[in-house]
């Protein structure tokens, strides 16, 4: 006859783990002291001086070298572009800093700053373009051509 082996397995419950040893539960006193210990706050306003200098350098480059603006309005000399760029950035920074937004990270203020820089850069090159080439006199130029079309359509 075949012999059969009998195995006996005995199981026992592990000892109870105390609440302080339980790794899945944080102690309530610690949670109350610091509810979110890994909160990271990133603010993009105000920009660092290094960032502001980079903005000024980019403005100088845009105003003094060939760009979309220079093709349409002409470019500025390096020294003039430098002083214009500094004043554009300073004014835009002052306006944006005075603007009050409810966001915590400064994104809306940064948008206002960027918008002011763009607006002032365009105003500067347009003003320079108008000084460099005064508006055409009667009889030559776009204004007189438009005026003559209006006059002929009224007749």
Swiss-Prot record:
Domain of life: Eukaryota
Expressing tissues: Expressed in roots, stems and leaves.
Basic and acidic residues: bias regions: 146-155
Keywords: Cytoplasm, Golgi apparatus, Nucleus
Predominant localisation class: nucleus
UniProt keyword Cytoplasm, yes or no: yes
Alphabetical GO biological process terms: lateral root development; mitotic cell cycle
UniProt-annotated location(s): Nucleus envelope; Cytoplasm; Nucleus; Golgi apparatus
Any Pfam family hit: WPP
Region (Disordered): 1-41, 124-155
Region described as WPP: spans on this chain: 28-131
Amino acid composition bias (Low complexity), ranges on this chain: 7-39
A GO cellular component annotation in the UniProt record: nuclear matrix
Protein role: Regulates the mitotic activity in roots. Plays a role with HSP70-1 in facilitating WIT1 nuclear envelope targeting.
Domain writeup: The WPP domain is required for the nuclear envelope localization.
Assembly, per entry: Binds to FPP proteins. Interacts with WAP, WIP1, WIP2 and WIP3 through its WPP domain. Interacts with HSP70-1, HSP70-3 and WIT1. Component of a ternary complex composed of WPP1, HSP70-1 and WIT1.
Entry protein name: WPP domain-containing protein 1
Encoding gene per record: WPP1
